[in-house]
Amino acid sequence: MDFQDVNNVIESHPDMILKDKYIAIKKVNWLDKVTNIRKISKDLNIGLDSIIFIDDSPFEVNLVRSQLPELKVVKVPSKLHKYTEIMRNILGDFYNLTSSNEDESKTRIYKEQLKRHKIKKTFSNIDEYLSSLCLEISISENSNSIVDRISQISLKTNQFNLTTRRYTETDIFGFIEDTRYCVYSLSVCDKYGDYGSTGLAIILINGGIATIDSFLISCRIIGRYIEFSFIDYIINKMRDNNIEFLNAKYIKTGKNNQTENFYEDCGFDLIETSKTSKIYSLKLEKYTINGKKDYIEVIDE
């Protein structure tokens, strides 16, 4: 299988609608589909549950379906007249009623991630690699201008999502207009490009007690310790508002296991635990700023 032959088909075949500029990554080799899908997930830093596999081979479809149950798998029908039915069934996976600027920039964002992945291989130390990125995070409070993206993050993020509560744009507007709530949105960039709006925290304030309703970051920025800088920022804001205690909850979903001990790692006290959840509280005067990584610059917008 020749890489150039594939490129020629993409660019020259009269029936090929998708051109190279729309394709973030190609795997042209003799490896099995399961291995290549795993590599794509790693290279683009996206979850397997964000990938849809489409193939006309019953063998390949069954192999991927059995080995990667997180994926949505679609078999291309052998009869042309059934194509419309298949497209109708998967339409919701590809189209939103509204789109954000970041939706239109997804291919660029993924190509920038490929550059990072290639550079990462040249470093033997993860801290040196992350420091080389020149990471900047910008945090906005109660921003009306990106409510569409804030809602998208809430609806789509599974892995680093402590409670996995889903909120529509109407819900987010409601939080912003309610003086009891603070909605913090996080955006990240580095020397290779802009990751876009990739984090969300919703805080309920009641007297001297604040409760984290939602805390989540997109999988595309996982592994950079950004979550610690984000929680540091929120805690500082709560201190500025004379909040004495910050309460939080972890709700287990099966997809967010990696976040199970996040609040404990941040110094929260575990108050109550069950098979499906953990409840925490933090006395803010006792909190020591994580400062996990000093290479992350935090900008207050």
PLM features per residue range, with description:
Residues 46-48, 180-181, 240-243:
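Short, high-confidence coil segments that cap the C-terminus of an alpha-helix
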Residues 188-191, 197-277:
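Acyl-donor binding region in acyl/amide transferases
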Residues 43, 65, 69-135, 236-301:
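Terminal substrate-recognition subdomain of acyl/acetyltransferases
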Residues 1-28:
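Substrate-recognition/cap helix-loop segment adjacent to the acidic, metal-dependent catalytic center
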Residues 2-7, 34-36, 58-62, 81, ...:
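Flexible loop/turn segments at secondary-structure boundaries
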Residues 37-58, 64:
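Conserved Lys-Pro-Asp/Glu-containing loop-to-beta segment of HAD-superfamily phosphomonoesterases
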Residues 3, 138-220:
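A conserved beta-strand-loop-helix scaffold within acyl/acetyltransferase catalytic domains
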Residues 25-29, 73-76, 138-141:
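Short acidic-hydrophobic, aromatic-tinged amphipathic segments that line or gate anion-handling sites
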